[in-house]
Amino acid sequence: MATAIRLLGRRVSSWRLRPSPSPLAVPRRAHSILPVDDDINGLNEEQKQLRHTISKFLQENLAPKAQEIDQTNDFKNLREFWKQLGSLGVLGITAPVQYGGSGLGYLEHVLVMEEISRASGAVGLSYGAHSNLCVNQIVRNGNEAQKEKYLPKLISGEFIGALAMSEPNAGSDVVSMKLKAEKKGDHYVLNGNKFWITNGPDADILVVYAKTDLTAVPASRGITAFIVEKGMPGFSTSKKLDKLGMRGSNTCELVFEDCKVPAANVLSQESKGVYVLMSGLDLERLVLAGGPLGIMQAVLDHTIPYLHVREAFGQKIGQFQLMQGKMADMYTRLMASRQYVYNVAKACDEGHIIPKDCAGVILYAAECATQVALDGIQCLGGNGYINDFPMGRFLRDAKLYEIGAGTSEVRRLVIGRAFNADFR
């Protein structure tokens, strides 16, 4: 832990994002960063310091640009910002120190995911795809040569990482994927495509799942995971997608046309990709659950102060009982979600990884985040409905978490089937 704090305390350069243009005439006090009571959250002193350090950096360097990133669907300083995150030691937060990582646990990973998402939901999603879906998969499943080759640059921020699992006709039914990998000598030839890939347009390194045995029964036994590098012959990306939310977190289709991938880039073993995939999904759901937490906190950061500045009928609208009820509902949804996520993260750090609870935390937090965002819009009234204010962005970003990393419906199936299995 001491190593992590040292890494997180590295000097950050003086680069600063330019503040976004002022919205409509809004009272200065209509937005503030509300304090988070981490005594209630059960964090130790080092975890509290982690939140403080990363939050201060993000509120100064990312939050002022979040609205512009959303409006333009572009983060112009992404590469430079990524190196800043690398300097803070958070891109490889669960990776061993020997590869440049911070050697921390999943609770710390959730905390960073939460605070980045609080500043910008889109950048938070890109962070999760890089640090968990790519870096953590290589940490958990890569051999020594792969770790030494890829992790240092991913962790420093020189490289951006991604994971490619979904296809146009293989989302929730991921084992029906059609991307084919044929062994030819010392390499594999990949043909097919992947879709909805977060960080796809920007990624230098991607963990890609493909079928090496199309006749395997069950089909899951024929899946193999590969490490693919940008620039490998036959690999290309299509134009980035124009999304409802998470704008600026670039997403695209990946195209493989006789793409040659060295056999040395097989992650784990041939036809063992489903184990890499499924074990990774549990931790993906856990870490990404930090995203809805951050969005909910951002809604409160904007809504609570607004209710105590805006006046109607001769008093602050936060004094009306209906608005007090809204504040209570938003706060308790956030706190209940936070406790569930943090406790599951602590259990995972102790080696107690339960799929139904990894599915449960993102199911509950995601649906709460959507409702909290809706409540925030209602509290701001007409201002909540115009794009000069960030409330619409919070709603659009929150909705992604009911769809990505397995839909809410699939998460309910995971939980229900777990209980059914207990009674076989």
From Swiss-Prot:
Cellular compartment(s): Mitochondrion matrix
One Gene Ontology cellular component annotation held by this UniProt entry: nucleoplasm
Function: Catalyzes the conversion of isovaleryl-CoA/3-methylbutanoyl-CoA to 3-methylbut-2-enoyl-CoA as an intermediate step in the leucine (Leu) catabolic pathway. To a lesser extent, is also able to catalyze the oxidation of other saturated short-chain acyl-CoA thioesters as pentanoyl-CoA, hexenoyl-CoA and butenoyl-CoA.
Positions of post-translational N6-succinyllysine modification: 56, 65, 76, 260, 316
Listed EC numbers: 1.3.8.4, 1.3.8.1
Post-translational modification: Acetylation of Lys-76 is observed in liver mitochondria from fasted mice but not from fed mice.
Name of the featured protein: Isovaleryl-CoA dehydrogenase, mitochondrial
Transit peptide residues according to the UniProt entry: 1-30
InterPro entries linked: Acyl-CoA_DH_CS (IPR006089), Acyl-CoA_Oxase/DH_mid-dom (IPR006091), Acyl-CoA_Oxase/DH_mid-dom_sf (IPR046373), AcylCo_DH-like_C (IPR036250), AcylCo_DH/oxidase_C (IPR009075), AcylCoA_DH/ox_N (IPR013786), AcylCoA_DH/ox_N_sf (IPR037069), AcylCoA_DH/oxidase_NM_dom_sf (IPR009100)
Broad class of enzyme this protein falls into: oxidoreductase
N6-acetyllysine: residues carrying this PTM: 56, 65, 76, 239, 260
Annotated active site: 284
Cofactor(s), names only, from the UniProt record: FAD
Subunit record text: Homotetramer.
Pathway(s) of this molecule: Amino-acid degradation; L-leucine degradation; (S)-3-hydroxy-3-methylglutaryl-CoA from 3-isovaleryl-CoA: step 1/3
Top-level taxon of origin: Eukaryota
UniProt record similarity statement: Belongs to the acyl-CoA dehydrogenase family.
Entry annotated with the keyword Oxidoreductase: yes
Catalytic activity: 3-methylbutanoyl-CoA + oxidized [electron-transfer flavoprotein] + H(+) = 3-methylbut-2-enoyl-CoA + reduced [electron-transfer flavoprotein]; pentanoyl-CoA + oxidized [electron-transfer flavoprotein] + H(+) = (2E)-pentenoyl-CoA + reduced [electron-transfer flavoprotein]; hexanoyl-CoA + oxidized [electron-transfer flavoprotein] + H(+) = (2E)-hexenoyl-CoA + reduced [electron-transfer flavoprotein]; butanoyl-CoA + oxidized [electron-transfer flavoprotein] + H(+) = (2E)-butenoyl-CoA + reduced [electron-transfer flavoprotein]
An example molecular function term from Gene Ontology annotations: flavin adenine dinucleotide binding
